[in-house]
């Protein structure tokens, strides 16, 4: 089983990202689970969402405390939250940032096995006209993890958002997929 934990802020679409990743894996014939964790969150407050993917039915129903993959939608969270808490030794961290690999690693409390960075904010602004990075960051997830194909991400996005909005969001994911830098550490 692969467990993915998303870190974002209220209103950024972390929950939607977790759901779209689950749908993309489902489209590939996998068993999935996606769910948010809500405390007293409000717009702008830190939010956590989770996705589990497996080749067999998933029976566990808890939050994800030891993720295989951590996805950070808002780079300011690197200063506010220990996003690597519980990260497995072979873990992957994916960060939306314009900063360098070295700058990101300085902020992580635990060094991942693999780090992926992409400026999903700029991609979202250019394509969507809004700094909502949830669909763009899924392109980085596809590239860095190989969990799902980018085509499955695009299809799941178009299932979630209809018409031109779906097309633009799928394009944002594809562009992020192409621009993501992946570093083996």
UniProtKB/Swiss-Prot annotation:
EC number(s) recorded for this UniProt protein: 1.2.7.1, 1.2.7.7
Molecular-function GO terms, alphabetical: 3-methyl-2-oxobutanoate dehydrogenase (ferredoxin) activity; pyruvate synthase activity
Keywords: Oxidoreductase
Pfam family, one: POR
Protein name in UniProt: Pyruvate/ketoisovalerate oxidoreductases common subunit gamma
InterPro entries attached to this UniProt entry: Oxidoreductase_gamma_subunit, PorC_KorC, Pyrv/ketoisovalerate_OxRed_cat, Pyrv_flavodox_OxRed_cen
SUPFAM superfamilies for this protein: Pyruvate-ferredoxin oxidoreductase, PFOR, domain III
Catalytic activity, as annotated: 2 oxidized [2Fe-2S]-[ferredoxin] + pyruvate + CoA = 2 reduced [2Fe-2S]-[ferredoxin] + acetyl-CoA + CO2 + H(+); 3-methyl-2-oxobutanoate + 2 oxidized [2Fe-2S]-[ferredoxin] + CoA = 2-methylpropanoyl-CoA + 2 reduced [2Fe-2S]-[ferredoxin] + CO2 + H(+)
Cysteine-cysteine disulfides: none
Subunit annotation: Heterotetramer of one alpha, one beta, one delta and one gamma chain.
């Amino acid at each position: 089983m692969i467990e993915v934990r998303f870190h974002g802020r209220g209103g950024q679409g972390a929950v939607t990202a977790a759901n779209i990743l689950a749908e993309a894996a489902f489209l590939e014939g996998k068993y999935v689970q996606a769910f948010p964790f809500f405390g007293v969150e409000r717009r702008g407050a830190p939010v956590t969402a989770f996705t589990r993917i497996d080749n067999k039915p998933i029976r566990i129903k808890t939050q994800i405390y030891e993720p295989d993959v951590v996805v950070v939608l808002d780079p300011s969270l690197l200063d506010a939250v220990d996003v690597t808490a519980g990260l497995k030794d072979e873990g992957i961290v994916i960060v939306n940032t314009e900063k360098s690999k070295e700058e990101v690693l300085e902020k992580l409390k635990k060094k991942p096995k693999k780090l992926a960075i992409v400026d999903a904010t700029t991609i979202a602004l250019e394509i969507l006209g809004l700094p909502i990075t949830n669909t763009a960051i899924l392109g980085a997830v596809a590239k860095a993890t190989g969990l799902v194909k980018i085509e499955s991400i695009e299809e799941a996005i178009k299932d979630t958002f209809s018409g031109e909005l779906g097309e633009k969001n799928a394009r944002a994911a594809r562009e992020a997929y192409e621009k993501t830098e992946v570093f083996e550490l």
